[in-house]
Amino acid sequence: MAQRRAAAESARHQRLLEGKAQAEGGSARTSLLILVSIFTIAAFLMFLVYKNFPQLSEEEGKCIKIPRDMDDAKALGKVLSKYKDTFYVQVLVAYFATYVFLQTFAIPGSIFLSILSGFLYPFPLALFLVCLCSGLGASFCYMLSYLVGRPVVYKYLTEKAVKWSEQVERHREHLINYIIFLRITPFLPNWFINITSPVINVPLKVFFIGTFLGVAPPSFVAIKAGTTLYQLTTAGEAVSWNSLFVLMILAILSILPALFQKKLKQKFE
């Protein structure tokens, strides 16, 4: 009986999203134009942020770019550490804006910025900064998806969105815990969580809080690794077996309240 009910619910979600895909399929081109416009405006704002940066030498200017590997991160860290005391606000604003920009548009590179924060700032500030940037950037991505991304989700991610929608409904009473669990664990890519959450009715407030708290444990690992930035050769070296074990324990703890309440509810019903 339960299996038939679950199958019926899955089919209902499938039909719902497919219907929305057909209804909004024609707006995909409009959504793309809006997305390009928003990206262009954001890129221009980033340009203004870097125009306000201190005067750099030609060699230093080559290092001011989004890091793609550990060598880029080391070169960028060397330049930023030179100027962060004299131009504290400018460096902090540039770091903040870049991190949020990458998260908003799901551009790779934020892991290196997380590591870099541990090199540039005291641990408490670095952790708060990374959690805030991650929470805001993911929330902006959420709002962007709500505004222009739904046709893409309906058309290309229908099946995956349906499966996650079912999981969200099962954990609706403990949605913050579930979001925290997903942020700690690698079961779902962050970009997928960001763009599908508004489509399956995850509230923005819950989404932000769950993200802010959920990224803290993995960020803790990256920031601690940043204190030894110049000893690292790849981002993978930032994660040890001990840190993976700790993350696993924290992930289990984050979902325990939901499991206990579910068991208690079943016991007393």
From Swiss-Prot:
Domain of life, per lineage: Eukaryota
Entry keyword set: Autophagy, Endoplasmic reticulum, Lipid transport, Membrane, Neurogenesis, Transmembrane, Transmembrane helix, Transport
Catalysed reaction, written as an equation: a 1,2-diacyl-sn-glycero-3-phospho-L-serine(in) = a 1,2-diacyl-sn-glycero-3-phospho-L-serine(out); cholesterol(in) = cholesterol(out); a 1,2-diacyl-sn-glycero-3-phosphocholine(in) = a 1,2-diacyl-sn-glycero-3-phosphocholine(out); a 1,2-diacyl-sn-glycero-3-phosphoethanolamine(in) = a 1,2-diacyl-sn-glycero-3-phosphoethanolamine(out)
Main location: endoplasmic reticulum
A single GO BP: nervous system development
Topology of this chain in the membrane: Multi-pass membrane protein
GO CC terms in record: endoplasmic reticulum membrane; mitochondria-associated endoplasmic reticulum membrane contact site
Subcellular location, record wording: Endoplasmic reticulum membrane; Endomembrane system
An MF annotation (GO) of this entry: phospholipid scramblase activity
Keyword field contains Transmembrane helix: yes
tRNA processing recorded as keyword: no
Transmembrane segments: 30-50, 87-107, 125-147, 175-195, 203-223, 240-260
Pfam families recorded: VTT_dom
Job description of the protein: Phospholipid scramblase involved in lipid homeostasis and membrane dynamics processes. Has phospholipid scramblase activity toward cholesterol and phosphatidylserine, as well as phosphatidylethanolamine and phosphatidylcholine. Required for autophagosome formation: participates in early stages of autophagosome biogenesis at the endoplasmic reticulum (ER) membrane by reequilibrating the leaflets of the ER as lipids are extracted by ATG2 (ATG2A or ATG2B) to mediate autophagosome assembly.
Domain free text: The VTT domain was previously called the SNARE-assoc domain. As there is no evidence that this domain associates with SNARE proteins, it was renamed as VMP1, TMEM41, and TVP38 (VTT) domain.
Family from the record: Belongs to the TMEM41 family.
Name of this protein: Transmembrane protein 41B
Originating species: Gallus gallus
